[in-house]
UniProtKB/Swiss-Prot annotation:
GO annotation, biological process: L-histidine biosynthetic process
Gene: hisI
Name under which the protein is recorded: Histidine biosynthesis bifunctional protein HisIE
Main location: cytoplasm
Cellular compartment(s): Cytoplasm
Residue ranges of the region described as Phosphoribosyl-AMP cyclohydrolase: 1-110
Amino acid sequence: MLTEQLDWEKTDGMMPAIVQHAVSGEVLMLGYMNKEALEKTEATGKVTFYSRTKQRLWTKGETSGNVLNVVSITPDCDNDTLLVLVNPIGPTCHKGTTSCFGETGHQWLFLYQLEQLLAERKHADPESSYTAKLYASGTKRIAQKVGEEGVETALAATVNDRFELKNEASDLMYHLLVLLQDQGLDLGEVIDNLKSRH
């Protein structure tokens, strides 16, 4: 168990826990865990801290619903600090921002947020949005759209139309993300696959 390998004496029983977005790498917040908070975090898969002001365990998002789903917990080389990789549901900060350190503007984070939105639309009323209608039309139609947008992207590049290339590449990425969601895959899996090749 992770609690046993940590140096609790060095931290006076309160382990600093740096919370980082598992996809974008953005630092979201810093909290403190005692042994009980860490054990609850491991047991539930939701980040739980020890609140020094409330003097009790506090699961992030327990009232707002903006929970932090744990991907991994790794101690540093001295076993006196934790790095907690998470997939957040909603904003992390009580001020409504992605990070407690303000909006850092990480561009890759937008793709993750778009992917979350597309996942929500998968089960929405087809009349509510283009995306929901696209899901309702089925895999063949979604795949056809990816093919069409791929060809249009290539054609824009061959005529050196940077404006149109940007627009068509955006359409291609959008439709590709819809197709991945339709097939139960996410962008993280594609990124992992790319990493394994290089």
